[in-house]
């Protein structure tokens, strides 16, 4: 019945094509305006626009738009057509017929090839072979026996062919292993990583990757390998060497010792000594000789070639001689020139205060310290440091005393830990960049003249490396693995990850992560800028004041009007009665956030001024916190500040329950929950 219906449909289509009758399509889709012949086709077309698929498969629950598509899909679950040769299933009759034709073609081609071979071998004249063989296996492998037609027929019976791809195999086990490729099965599974393999040998090789065992060991250099093929490749390195091959082919003397050859400590290469020949082992057997081809005399490491051994050099011990090829690279003057060039580049790029210069010294100079300078005692270091400073210091007369001012770069103040042993124990610069108990003020300059002196460089940096490696980096961050010198800085860093900004401005409501940032921001709301030097030029930022060209401002600790919190330091030389004074180039803001209460002086202005004038300006801060000693202008700000110590946040959001310390923060947060619609209605985002 199905065949008859198909023939009728074909005849109708042929008649329509031959006569080219015009089709009448009165039914139009009101969405895409397509025309259809029948209402059923129009209804089926509407399913495309609605997205409905009414026909569902019972097995896999797939849906289809037409019944024909469902019937075609159901054939994939049943696969009614089965091949009797390779046991494969097909859902379509056409593909099944094509598949059977392939089997017939391969079978016919194989039969034709076998017949041609038999005819060609039978035509050849066979003569008697009188060769004798020691074993039956060698006789079976002889080519004359293979040319026998009776032998070839027996051989052909034992050939196992694959029914899928037609490949031939000598045994059934190999054929079964080959069939796994077509089926996709991997029966051998690893217990540790659940990887599967087709052969057991592959699984055993894979299991070696999980263990640290190296069963295959090189007999020359005792290096272990997990796979035998890698061991064979490694042995080619030994046999490829000319000196190694010469040793193998050379006649051994029985008088020489059987141990490995001696190594000369004065030479860097391998000394080819004579190796004794054992009575049991064959002298030409490579595996019976224990040879280390190229070995370093100091660290006793083995290398595969002489070139690698020449490139390798052990670091010379302290006080030892430097090789001639390293003398040029570790020249003392070239290192100082490189340091100065990098420092100039760092200044032009305007990097941070001292960290850039410190990194330059750390990477370029201290790396080569062991080759340049040996150990020095602390007394020698102090003498060389004071004598070198005497060449580059400047004298200044103040009253009846003649004082000497050191010209130190500002970055050396922060490297106080490296300057231990240079000054006496009373005058050592502390780690927190402050000075202890003596009149030692610091004035800044470019520092190029100071760095040109090699003695100062050698003395200033001839300290143990432990001071640099273990420089108070104790507290690491568990999120980004950054290291900080103190817990307070780590807590301040955690605010970046949490997103908190606890310090808010009362005027504009901006929030900041640090109190110093808030204080700097509050100066933008003031009418007058607080930071002004003696030239009466106002600045909006503290950094702009420090970069001012006329800013020759010094901390003066020798005046009578001593500001609170400033310490006196003095370093006296044995030759003179004058003290050594170091004056700072830049300001260091105090913990209170305002300008330090120190006396400012300039070389061009009057050095005598009263401290009371500066104190009158700061008398505005009347209300002081009893916990942290911070001062405020009004009691309301002091009360708000006390909330930080108490940990209270009185303003709570009614939507999400978050608490805030200030009302502007709470109002600004509430805007995140509400938004305006175009009609002017305000809708809460949480409750819709």
Swiss-Prot record:
The keyword Transcription applies. GO terms for molecular function: DNA-binding transcription activator activity, RNA polymerase II-specific; RNA polymerase II cis-regulatory region sequence-specific DNA binding; zinc ion binding. Its main location: nucleus. One of its GO terms (cellular component) is nucleus. There is a cross-link at residues 11, 112, 121, 146, 262, 420, 437, 681 (Glycyl lysine isopeptide (Lys-Gly) (interchain with G-Cter in SUMO2)). Keywords: DNA-binding, Isopeptide bond, Metal-binding, Nucleus, Repeat, Transcription, Transcription regulation, Ubl conjugation, Zinc, Zinc-finger. Signal peptide: none annotated. It is found in: Nucleus. The keyword Zinc-finger applies. A zinc finger (C2H2-type) spans 27-49, 55-77, 81-103, 160-182, 188-210, 216-238, 294-318, 475-497, 503-525, 623-645, 651-673. PANTHER family: ZINC FINGER PROTEIN, ZINC FINGER PROTEIN-RELATED. May be involved in transcriptional regulation. Belongs to the krueppel C2H2-type zinc-finger protein family. This is Zinc finger protein 770. The lineage of its organism: Eukaryota, Metazoa, Chordata, Craniata, Vertebrata. The gene is ZNF770.
